[in-house]
């Protein structure tokens, strides 16, 4: 910028030749010039009629060594001495690698004339838009996308675009060049192992990657809903001081248009700073009748939950609605949020109003009125005060008020109010602004005012534009014409002149509005007075967002517009501009029920394009130069009028206003017990009369009271008085599945063709409109296709791009597909192998008569169900007219992968039938386990001869589930510290680093710290340019916000506590000092008085004579303390505070005389203790304090406390280890022991979880500080330039990566299914990190539930149905949780996470009593009432006893039926140490209702059939035996001896020795060793097999069980087993015939085989 300043000074010193004297030459160019784009400029001569040839040239800045473009134009009187040449600046000739802003010099020369202007460059050479086929995807699915590209003239542009896909963490995982003209763009396939969240598809031009365009989409596991729920509040806001209740209407419609019958569960709540605070009492059960229902939030319910309602103003009400169909078959959860809690229903803004006015001339005040949710408020009367004017808002929320301004004023104060007749005066919205008078040049008093009175402007309109002038007569007489420019989309679109007749003060012209002016334009005009003065004005004009061209999608005929049948043939017709390229996609509307925010639309396209407008205001300007600057233009004249130099292509953004902080007080009971006069004692009594969920005696409850003896006495008296009273209820509902015992005439199931094609999107086609256009210039094309099988409404979306009219998004065309009778098979997203699950087939009857339906579940060997290979499962139901019925099927998936479930149904006496076949995803059992290996690639220090080679060993996969896949992802990234820093700046990623929510004085410091350290690091290393200089502003604002908020908790003596009314905390005050001292290096306006006041308080109030610091009030949030809590507390606290004093020393030394002596006393105390410390953590912390004080240079004690000289660890304290090791690193850096620091840094970086976050706050903060200080202290890195080669087994070609500065933060990733050794080599300069993530499924062992440091017991029992229960509850259970801490002292700050049973909700009243009474058992609780998935309750405990069980008990209530309830879980864990945790499961009916299956290891076979055998018939003879043994599917016939019977799980294993192979089969050598026959335990009695007996046995090939190298045999109903008498028994007359038959059977089959 210094070079530019010097250049501008030099330019101003250039003299103008005499021949131009007396004329005014004006040169205008866009304020920002785009590369590779034709840009129009203007040169005008006023007062000179001599023809001239003008040379226009563009040069590099500042040296002007290159001519980037040149042209020559003629200026002559015939053209009005005005020319508008175009210039183009080629990007290829510029230094695009420069991190600094780039400029060019645009020069106009002619004999006797030279004008030039330095103009900012932009590499934005066009617009790119990405359309994805959907806005939401599941793992493993393809993301189809197409690219639309056009230049700034809205002309189609088919140059290459780079498309990148980025994970929610910002990691680029794919980057490919794409030709927008191609219709065969390969989709991006999401991996199965994928990050959930919002992904980005980013497009950028290949030759200008600085400008990018983004499409967003979500990735998560989901199932499409069967219907749509809309929630419509009665108002878009809630009056906080109103008296009326708040109503919401609920509408539920199937996606094919029919109305839903069912029930809705509605829960209201308030969202405060992003955190949801539910109102448990508002949970209501609402009937949905004919698709509609209404819920109400009663005013008194809200006020009971939040006592101080005014604290809610500015926050949002939300309502969560769960709708369940009458059949219980389907459920949809939706939430309506953004219902603002307000004191006035409207908000007024002046966003489209100029800030400047012309005294004595009309001032157009554009008032914009919105509802609290930001939507436009139509038909609202508004009125301005001081200068009276009134109007009414239009549909877009705007109203234009014309104010006639007085003469001779410099500012104009304006107040506008709404004037709604139904609102009292105090509820009318009001907004004030001050407009400033336009400053005339040299105080001439000459003005120009452009007036455009029309508001809703659209293409095809003729817009009147008025030019008003005011000034002295001599000046006005010189005006012969107005020169005007029309700017749109950042370009000068048109230049013209409007003549003015003598004496005309008002001149009007008509401007035709063409599609080129969409979405908005600026109209700027000026006139000249003499040869020096320019008088200018401008106005911004909005144009209705429509297509520049035409695109319509409709049915090709009237038949195509009707309701269609699945699979039917139909046609659509496309109508649009000739030559248009049209992209089509059909999307199931159910997708938009889940997510519609990312759908491409015409408005979104224009919103993006409008950002290319380089103008920054709604019009006008501070003075004549300001008019040009604010319109986005650069001006230079021959009389040295020059606009200011622009240095940013973007307009300056207003600072975000800081939201009002609101501390919401939770409700507490204030009812009174009349017999106790004292209010506090009334509370104790009332709490004593509450029912205790745990069933504790009054005497035990009294032990929890901390309020004193008087309270205990009152509590005990009232508790004993009310003892034994319960108030519960229960209401039973049972789901009854009707069955029919008769068979009738049904359409044959074998003739039913099942529907099986259910895509979420399809019709992904690109069509060209090349047909001859009709008389209206429209081309059309008919597209035939066959519909897919879904019963739904398809939304066909068409997007076109034409050669000259840009992009057009057509109105979606809907195709509704349904049948009068059909099946909807509802499947979960996935199920776990070998775990039972219920699926439902919902049968819909949309005819006017009741029907009888036979339903069949088809057999699939991949599932165990009531349908078997030999027996169909059928059931018959009656469905009433215009209703539905759910038929549940219980299955057990036996094989991993995608498997078909098929259900068919036919209507008795009719040809109506339907079948559905869907794929169900079966995932492996066990628990997903991740193994992360991190390897630092640093060839300069770790390599030999400049190359680092490393063997990466295969992981030990402990307890891997057999026959399951392994996923290994290998990713390589540059400099990891930079990655951590970058993620810390990003607000979304910052939230992942911080566990505790912000709010109180402690939480606020947790939130503020990472930004301070990150900003300090980036400032020191000068890396802001690589991350985006604008992000520093974000970080500084974050720090300032944290600083300002922390001052709320500062006491008068400069100490701090979580809340002002709590005792001051030494640790927190020191922490504030530490963080604020660091913040002064990046935010200079932090007051030294604030920091030094805290230091002085610590010295005077908390330091003892021996130098030690004391803590009288520990912090609430113990996780802040990190490792400082625990053993050796005095040393830890003193060292921590000494570090804070040392880091603030440079700020406070001259303000606090006793600071040095305080530091010396504390350091002396630590020196005496240092060599005797036991904990590695305390040793590291103390070492850093002493090294920072300059008293420690010997690292022997520190290194002796380490493990392997690279870490300081303690048992089961992972996060403390990171923190302690980081303190050790800081100590080594202070001692300048860099060689010792290197392995420490490597260990620290290796501990980072995959994705880049540490586990706990202090560990992250200190770890981050250590790594940042290491980067600062170590010598600067060489330029990053690494070549990495990975050699994977079974891949012939090695994988090669090049990492340099351009892609350092891009994760370059490869995947493999193998877990084998591989090698990696790195050469070059710089560092990189290779992360190997191996994911597999580990078996859940019986000891997997072993708990660490906690004992936990969970039980559940049913409550008597005669007792009272919650309204709408079908069943009530009591959940009891008992836990004990297994450490030496009580555990503090413990969390219990309860995962609810599906369909159940916790009783909020019970939980409130546990948290609100004087006998308080829990600190607080949070409820997540998502019944669609498992809800959860989070319970916070201040402590858990180490000497006795702490028990909690509360009710949970079933609100809807679930066919098969999966177990819930309870997890208890320490907030300070996540390794200390325990999990237990609970279930109301454990061990009941399970299908029978036989398992060996993790392989299971279905056994859901009777225990009858094939040979259990009345009469059997030799011929029947031969006939049955020789049936085609019989695999073997043996004579075998039963050796023993083994029991395993629910199966019996009969171990048999094959004595004779009568008919050989699959088992090639069955006599080699005993064979196992497996049967259900329940069949033991029916089989009645005896050890040491011989048997004739045969079975089917389908009953063989292949397990690796051996075969087992299943005993099923198809198995033939007969006892074969021994030799002695065969002599008896009773068995002689049987023995002869067996011998003859054996001889016949052995010698002759089976007959043909």
UniProtKB/Swiss-Prot annotation:
Expressed by the venom gland. Residues 657-740, 992-1270 form a propeptide. Belongs to the venom complement C3 homolog family. Disulfide bonds join 547-808, 616-651, 684-711, 685-718, 698-719, 864-1502, 1347-1478, 1378-1447, 1495-1500, 1507-1579, 1526-1650, 1626-1635. The keyword Chloroplast does not apply. Complement-activating protein in venom. It is a structural and functional analog of complement component C3b, the activated form of C3. It binds factor B (CFB), which is subsequently cleaved by factor D (CFD) to form the bimolecular complex VF/Bb. VF/Bb is a C3/C5 convertase that cleaves both complement components C3 and C5. Structurally, it resembles the C3b degradation product C3c, which is not able to form a C3/C5 convertase. Unlike C3b/Bb, VF/Bb is a stable complex and completely resistant to the actions of complement regulatory factors H (CFH) and I (CFI). Heterotrimer of alpha, beta and gamma chains; disulfide-linked. Is active with factor B in the presence of factor D. First processed by the removal of 4 Arg residues by furin-type protease, forming two chains, alpha and gamma/beta precursor, linked by a disulfide bond. Probably, a cobrin-like protease cleaves the C3a-like domain and then the C3d-like domain, generating the mature venom factor (VF). PROSITE patterns: ALPHA_2_MACROGLOBULIN, ANAPHYLATOXIN_1, ANAPHYLATOXIN_2, NTR. It is found in: Secreted. This is Venom factor. Mg(2+) binds at residues 519, 542-543, 545. GO terms for molecular function: endopeptidase inhibitor activity; metal ion binding; toxin activity. Residues 684-719 form the Anaphylatoxin-like domain. Residues 1507-1650 form the NTR domain. There is a cross-link at residues 1000-1003 (Isoglutamyl cysteine thioester (Cys-Gln)). Keywords: Cleavage on pair of basic residues, Complement system impairing toxin, Disulfide bond, Magnesium, Metal-binding, Secreted, Signal, Thioester bond, Toxin. Its main location: secreted. InterPro entries: A-macroglobulin_rcpt-bd (IPR009048), A-macroglobulin_rcpt-bd_sf (IPR036595), A2M/Complement_sys (IPR050473), A2M_N_BRD (IPR011625), Alpha-macroglob_thiol-ester_cl (IPR047565), Alpha-macroglobulin_TED (IPR011626), Anaphylatoxin/fibulin (IPR000020), Anaphylatoxin_comp_syst (IPR018081). GO terms for cellular component: extracellular space. Residues 1197-1260 are annotated as: Factor H binding site. One of its GO terms (biological process) is inflammatory response.
């Amino acid at each position: 910028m210094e070079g530019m300043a010097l250049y501008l000074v030099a330019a101003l010193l250039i003299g103008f030749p005499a021949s131009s004297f007396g004329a005014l030459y004006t040169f205008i160019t866009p304020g920002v010039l785009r590369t590779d784009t034709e840009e129009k400029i203007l040169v005008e001569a006023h007062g000179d009629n001599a023809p001239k040839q003008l040379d226009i040239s563009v040069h590099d800045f500042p040296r002007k060594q290159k001519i980037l473009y040149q042209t020559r134009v003629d200026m002559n009187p015939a053209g009005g001495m005005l020319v508008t040449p175009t210039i183009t600046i080629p990007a290829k000739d510029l230094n695009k690698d420069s991190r600094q802003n780039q400029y060019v010099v645009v020069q106009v020369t002619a004999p006797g004339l030279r004008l030039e202007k330095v103009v900012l460059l932009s590499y934005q050479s066009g617009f790119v838009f990405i359309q994805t086929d959907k806005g939401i995807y599941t793992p493993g699915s393809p993301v189809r996308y197409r690219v639309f590209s056009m230049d700034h003239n809205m002309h189609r542009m088919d140059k290459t675009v780079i498309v990148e896909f980025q994970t929610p963490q910002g990691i680029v995982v794919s980057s490919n060049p794409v030709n927008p003209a191609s219709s065969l763009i390969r989709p991006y396939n999401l991996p199965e192992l994928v990050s959930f969240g919002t992904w980005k598809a980013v497009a950028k031009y290949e030759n200008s990657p600085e400008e990018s365009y983004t499409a967003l989409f979500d990735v998560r596991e989901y199932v499409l809903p069967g219907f749509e729920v809309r929630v419509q509040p009665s108002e878009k806001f809630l009056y906080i001081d109103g008296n009326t209740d708040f109503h919401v209407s609920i509408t539920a419609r199937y996606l094919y248009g029919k109305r839903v019958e069912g029930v809705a569960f509605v829960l209201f709540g308030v969202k405060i700073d992003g955190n949801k605070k539910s109102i448990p009492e508002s949970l209501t059960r609402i009937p949905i009748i004919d698709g509609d229902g209404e819920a109400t939030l009663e005013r008194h319910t809200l006020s009971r939950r939040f006592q101080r309602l005014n604290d809610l103003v500015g926050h949002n009400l939300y309502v969560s609605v769960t709708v369940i169909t009458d059949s219980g078959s389907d459920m949809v959860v939706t939430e309506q949020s953004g219902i603002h809690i307000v004191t006035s229903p409207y908000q007024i803004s002046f966003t489209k109003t100029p800030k400047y006015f012309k005294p004595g001339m009309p001032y157009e005040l554009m008032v914009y009125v919105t509802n609290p949710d930001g939507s436009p408020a139509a038909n609202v009367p508004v009125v301005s005060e001081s200068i009276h004017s009134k109007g009414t808002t239009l549909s877009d929320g705007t109203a234009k008020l014309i104010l006639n301004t007085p003469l001779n004023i410099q500012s104009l104060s304006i107040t506008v109010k709404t004037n709604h007749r139904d609102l009292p005066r105090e509820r009318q919205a009001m907004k004030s602004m001050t407009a400033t008078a336009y400053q005339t040049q040299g105080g001439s008093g000459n003005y120009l005012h452009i007036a455009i009175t029309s508001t809703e402007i659209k293409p095809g309109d003729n817009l009147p534009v008025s030019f008003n002038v005011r000034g002295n007569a001599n000046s006005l007489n010189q005006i012969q014409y107005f020169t005007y420019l029309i700017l749109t989309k950042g370009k000068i679109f048109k230049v013209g002149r409007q003549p003015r007749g003598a004496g005309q003060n008002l001149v009007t012209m008509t401007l035709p509005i063409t599609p080129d002016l969409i979405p908005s334009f600026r109209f700027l005009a000026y006139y000249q007075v003499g040869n020096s003065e320019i008088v200018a004005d401008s106005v911004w004009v909005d144009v209705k967002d429509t297509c520049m061209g035409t695109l319509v999608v409709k049915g090709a005929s009237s038949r195509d517009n009707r309701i269609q049948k699945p699979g039917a043939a139909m046609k659509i017709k496309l109508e649009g501009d000739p030559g248009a390229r049209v992209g089509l996609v059909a999307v199931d509307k159910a997708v938009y029920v889940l997510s519609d925010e990312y759908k491409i639309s015409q408005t979104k396209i224009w919103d993006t394009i409008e950002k290319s407008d380089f103008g920054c205001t709604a019009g006008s300007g501070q003075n004549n130069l300001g008019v040009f600057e604010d319109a986005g233009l650069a001006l230079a004249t021959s009389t040295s009028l020059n606009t200011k130099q622009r240095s940013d292509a973007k307009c300056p953004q207003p600072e975000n206003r800081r939201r009002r902080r609101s501390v919401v007080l939770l409700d507490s009971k204030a009812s009174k017990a009349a017999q106790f006069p004292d209010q506090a004692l009334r509370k104790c009594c009332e709490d004593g009369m509450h029912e205790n969920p745990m069933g504790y005696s009054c005497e035990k409850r009294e032990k929890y009271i901390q309020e004193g003896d008087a309270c205990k006495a009152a509590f005990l008296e009232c508790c004993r008085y009310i003892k034994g009273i319960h108030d519960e209820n229960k209401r039973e509902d049972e789901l009854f599945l009707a069955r029919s015992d008769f068979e009738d005439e049904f359409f044959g199931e074998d003739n039913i063709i099942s529907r099986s094609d259910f895509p979420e999107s399809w019709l992904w086609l690109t069509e060209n409109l090349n047909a001859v256009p009709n008389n209206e210039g429209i081309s059309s094309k008919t597209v035939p296709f066959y519909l897919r099988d879904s019963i739904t409404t398809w939304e066909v979306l068409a997007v076109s791009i034409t050669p000259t009219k840009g992009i057009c998004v057509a109105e979606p065309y809907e195709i509704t597909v349904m049948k009068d009778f059909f099946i909807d098979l509802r499947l979960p997203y996935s199920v776990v192998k070998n775990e039972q699950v219920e699926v439902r087939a919902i049968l819909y009857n949309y005819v006017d008569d009741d029907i009888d339906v036979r339903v069949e579940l088809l057999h699939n060997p991949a599932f165990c169900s009531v349908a078997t290979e030999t027996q169909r499962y059928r059931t018959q139901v009656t469905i009433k007219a215009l209703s539905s019925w759910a038929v549940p099927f219980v299955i057990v998936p036996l094989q991993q992968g995608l498997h078909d479930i098929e259900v068919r149904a036919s209507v008795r006496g009719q040809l109506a039938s339907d079948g559905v076949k869907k794929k169900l995803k079966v995932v492996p059992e066990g628990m997903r386990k991740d193994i992360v290996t991190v390897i630092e690639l640093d060839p300069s220090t770790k390599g030999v001869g400049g190359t680092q080679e490393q063997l990466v060993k295969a992981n030990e996969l402990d307890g891997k589930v057999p026959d399951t896949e392994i996923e290994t992802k290998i990713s390589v990234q540059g400099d990891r510290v930079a990655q951590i820093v970058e993620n810390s700046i990003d607000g979304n990623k910052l939230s992942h680093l911080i566990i505790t929510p912000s709010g109180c004085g402690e939480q606020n410091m947790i939130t503020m710290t990472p930004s301070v350290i990150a900003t300090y690091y980036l400032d020191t290393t000068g890396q802001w340019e690589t991350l985006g200089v604008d992000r520093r502003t974000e970080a500084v604002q974050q720090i300032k916000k944290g600083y300002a908020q922390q001052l709320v908790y500062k006491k008068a003596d400069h100490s701090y506590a979580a809340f002002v009314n709590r005792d001051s905390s030494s640790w927190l005050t020191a922490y504030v000092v530490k963080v604020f001292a660091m913040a002064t290096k990046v935010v200079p306006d932090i007051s030294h008085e604030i920091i030094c006041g805290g230091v002085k308080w610590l010295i005077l109030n908390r330091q003892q004579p021996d130098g030690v610091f004391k803590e009288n009030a520990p912090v609430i949030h113990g996780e802040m303390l990190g490792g400082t809590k625990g053993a050796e507390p005095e040393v830890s606290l003193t060292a921590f505070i000494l570090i804070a004093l040392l880091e603030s020393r440079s700020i406070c030394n001259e303000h606090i005389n006793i600071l040095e002596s305080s530091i010396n006393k504390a350091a002396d105390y630590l020196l005496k203790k240092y060599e005797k410390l036991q904990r590695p953590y305390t040793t590291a912390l103390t070492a850093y304090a002493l090294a920072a004080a300059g008293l420690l240079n010997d690292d022997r004690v520190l290194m002796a406390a380490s493990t392997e000289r690279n870490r300081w660890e303690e048992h089961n304290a992972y996060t403390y280890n990171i923190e302690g090791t980081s303190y050790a690193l800081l100590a080594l850096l202070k001692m300048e022991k860099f060689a010792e620091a290197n392995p420490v840094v490597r260990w620290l970086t290796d501990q980072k979880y995959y994705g880049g976050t540490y586990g706990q706050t202090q560990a992250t903060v200190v770890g981050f500080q250590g790594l940042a200080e290491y980067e600062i202290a170590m010598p600067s890195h060489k330029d990053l330039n690494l070549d990495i080669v990975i050699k994977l087994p079974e891949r012939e070609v090695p994988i090669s990566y090049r990492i340099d500065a351009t892609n350092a933060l891009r994760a370059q990733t490869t995947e493999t299914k193998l877990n084998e050794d591989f090698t990696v080599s790195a050469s070059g300069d710089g560092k990189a990190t290779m992360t190997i993530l191996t994911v597999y499924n580990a078996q859940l062992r019986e000891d997997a539930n072993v708990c660490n440091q906690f004992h936990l017991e969970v039980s559940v029992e049913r409550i008597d149905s005669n007792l009272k229960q919650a309204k709408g509850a079908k069943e009530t259970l009591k959940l009891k949780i008992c836990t004990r801490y297994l450490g030496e002292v009580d555990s503090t700050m413990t969390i219990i996470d309860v995962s609810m049973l599906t369909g159940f909700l916790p009783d909020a009243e019970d939980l409130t009593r546990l948290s609100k009474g004087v006998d308080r058992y829990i600190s607080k609780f949070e409820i997540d009432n998502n019944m669609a998935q498992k809800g959860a309750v989070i319970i916070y405990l201040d402590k858990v006893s180490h000497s006795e069980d702490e028990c909690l008990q509360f009710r949970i209530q079933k609100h809807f039926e679930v066919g098969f309830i999966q177990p819930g879980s309870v997890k208890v864990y320490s907030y300070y140490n996540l390794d200390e945790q325990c999990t237990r499961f609970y279930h109301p009916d454990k061990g009941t209702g399970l299908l029978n299956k036989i398992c060996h290891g993790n392989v299971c076979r279905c056994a859901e059939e009777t225990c009858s055998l094939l040979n259990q018939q009345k009469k059997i003879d030799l011929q029947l035996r031969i006939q049955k043994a020789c049936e085609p599917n019989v695999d073997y016939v043996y004579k075998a001896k039963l050796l023993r019977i083994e029991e395993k799980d629910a199966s019996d294993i009969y171990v048999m020795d094959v004595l004779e192979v009568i008919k050989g089969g699959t088992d090639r050598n069955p006599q080699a060793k005993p064979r196992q026959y497996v049967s259900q335990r329940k069949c033991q009695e029916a089989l009645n097999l005896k050890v040491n007996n011989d048997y004739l046995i045969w079975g089917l090939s389908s009953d063989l069980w292949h397990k690796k190298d051996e075969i087992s045999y299943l005993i099923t109903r198809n198995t033939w087993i007969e006892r074969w008498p021994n030799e002695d028994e065969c002599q008896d007359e009773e068995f002689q015939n049987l023995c002869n038959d067996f011998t003859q059977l054996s001889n016949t089959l052995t010698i002759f085989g089976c007959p043909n």
